[in-house]
Curated annotation (Swiss-Prot):
bZIP domain span: 187-250
Positions of the UniProt region annotated as Basic motif: 190-208
Quaternary structure annotation from Swiss-Prot or TrEMBL: DNA-binding heterodimer with GBF2 and GBF3; non DNA-binding homodimer.
Annotated GO biological process: positive regulation of DNA-templated transcription
Signal peptide: none
Compartment list: Nucleus
GO CC field: nucleus
Listed name of the protein: G-box-binding factor 4
Family (UniProt): Belongs to the bZIP family.
UniProtKB keywords: DNA-binding, Nucleus, Phosphoprotein, Transcription, Transcription regulation
Residue numbers spanned by region Leucine-zipper: 215-229
Classification lineage: Eukaryota, Viridiplantae, Streptophyta, Embryophyta, Tracheophyta
PANTHER family: CAMP-RESPONSE ELEMENT BINDING PROTEIN-RELATED (PTHR22952), G-BOX-BINDING FACTOR 4 (PTHR22952:SF184)
Annotated Gene3D superfamilies: 1.20.5.170
């Protein structure tokens, strides 16, 4: 049985309620002031639950009124659990439960990797793909007194790291593979274009050299033909002169008479 009682009260009731001691029931006695004005009247709600009484105070007008509300409520399991336990016991159980949860969190293995850790590690691996991690091997003392060195594993390439991390990040692995394939295709196309340019340049050089050799050969041939023609012309001229000398009749040339001297045929004297 839970009962609610609303009645007007003064500040003296509040002081008397605060000075009273807590009962042995598991219910908690508390007071709450909604308006701390000392001149205003206050109303009080008494809440009876499980054998205890809880009082709540709030501000109201000066008209006194009383209101009782009786509510029947089943409290079987709750009373059976809370019976025999005080507030300190409940608080100790809460604190011990929090400590247990903290200890359970601390006992979790540290090798668990979250998604943020994996993405950060993958970005670091991609940024340092071209760098070689050179570290001094650490010394370790064995039980027999001898020393051994632990050599760290080297990262070979970012592509291997991306392929090895497919289990934790499938999207990043696919993206890295697509980027590597695009880079490989671009490099292959660039290499093919370079090879084609070199082959075309070599073919043009060969054509130029062949044309130059052909021109030189033609010039030499023309020079030889010119010399041969000049020789033939000279020989033909000599043969013709020889034939003319054989065919012509020899003629004796008579000497010409001397020319008459000029004289004056008429002369006049003045």
């Amino acid at each position: 049985m839970a009962s609610f009682k609303l009645m007007s009260s003064s500040n003296s009731d509040l002081s008397r309620r605060n000075s009273s001691s807590a009962s042995s029931s598991p219910s908690i006695r508390s007071s709450h002031h909604l308006r701390p004005n000392p001149h205003a009247d206050h109303s009080r709600i008494s809440f009876a639950y499980g054998g205890g009484v809880n009082d709540y105070t709030f501000a109201s007008d000066s008209k006194p009124f009383e209101m009782a509300i009786d509510v029947d409520r089943s409290i079987g399991d709750r009373n059976s659990v809370n019976n025999g336990k005080s507030v300190d016991d409940v608080w100790k159980e809460i604190v011990s439960g929090e400590q247990k949860t903290i200890m359970m969190k601390e006992e979790e293995p540290e090798d668990i990797m979250t998604l943020e850790d994996f993405l950060a590690k993958a970005e670091m691996d991609e940024g340092a793909s071209d760098e070689i991690d050179v570290k001094i091997p650490t010394e370790r003392l064995n039980n027999d007194g001898s020393y051994t060195f632990d050599f760290p594993m080297q990262r070979h390439s970012s592509f291997q790291m991306v392929e090895g991390s497919m289990g934790g990040g499938v999207t990043r692995g696919k993206r890295g593979r697509v980027m590597m394939e695009a880079m490989d295709k671009a490099a292959a196309q660039r290499q093919k274009r370079m090879i084609k340019n070199r082959e075309s340049a070599a073919r043009s050089r060969e054509r130029k050299q062949a044309y130059q050799v052909e021109l030189e050969t033609l010039a030499a041939k023309l020079e030889e033909e010119n010399e041969q023609l000049l020789k033939e012309i000279e020989e033909s001229t000599k043969e013709r002169y020889k034939k003319l000398m054989e065919v012509l009749i020899p003629v004796d040339e008579k000497p010409r008479p001397p020319s008459r001297p000029l004289s004056r045929s008429h002369s006049l004297e003045w």
